[in-house]
């Protein structure tokens, strides 16, 4: 279902090497390939493809980046029999949603909100021939660097590492009251 063309015994005499090389290229593409897919324009559906025995399919890559200026909500689809995981990047401009789903059915989908211009790790499960699911498995992690108020759900274990503070910074309580302030020393 991801485009690799299986060879039967005695098949493709004289072209076996070429077809095998194409299959190896497909496998390489599936494990780490990158596709920059323009979805520019108004509200529309863009169908990503799988091409058996060929490396030209737009859904036959591990990472797919959506690009272009969008002026309406976008839907990007994959064929029903695809079962893999993707790293998706929304690099579009324009405040519209981008939905990633199977070509038909009412199974689960993954949608980038109008302001979400980030990455998602998704699994295309092909778990139902009529209504298969696509699931976001990003574990809620986005850019930790841009999170100005990260929160822990438990104790912080530094695993024998240090926590470094800038000069005149430290630990405050929930009301902003300073509890520990650290100063940089000369040694």
Annotate each language-model stretch with its function.
Residues 68, 102-104, 173:
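Short acidic, glycine-rich loop/turn motifs
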Residues 105-114:
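Short, aromatic/His-centered strand-loop micro-motif at the edge of beta-sheets
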Residues 24-34, 94-102, 121-140, 181-182, ...:
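Short, surface-exposed terminal/edge motifs of secreted or surface/virion proteins that either
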Residues 7:
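Catalytic-domain carbohydrate-binding cleft regions of carbohydrate-active enzymes
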Residues 81-83, 115-119, 168:
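Tight coil/turn sites that cap or link beta-strands
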Residues 17-19, 116-126:
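Extracellular disulfide-bonded cysteine-rich modules/repeats
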Residues 28, 33, 140-186:
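Register-specific beta-strand positions within repetitive beta-rich fiber domains
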Residues 1-2, 10-98, 132, 162:
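Exposed extracellular interaction/assembly regions and N-terminal maturation sites
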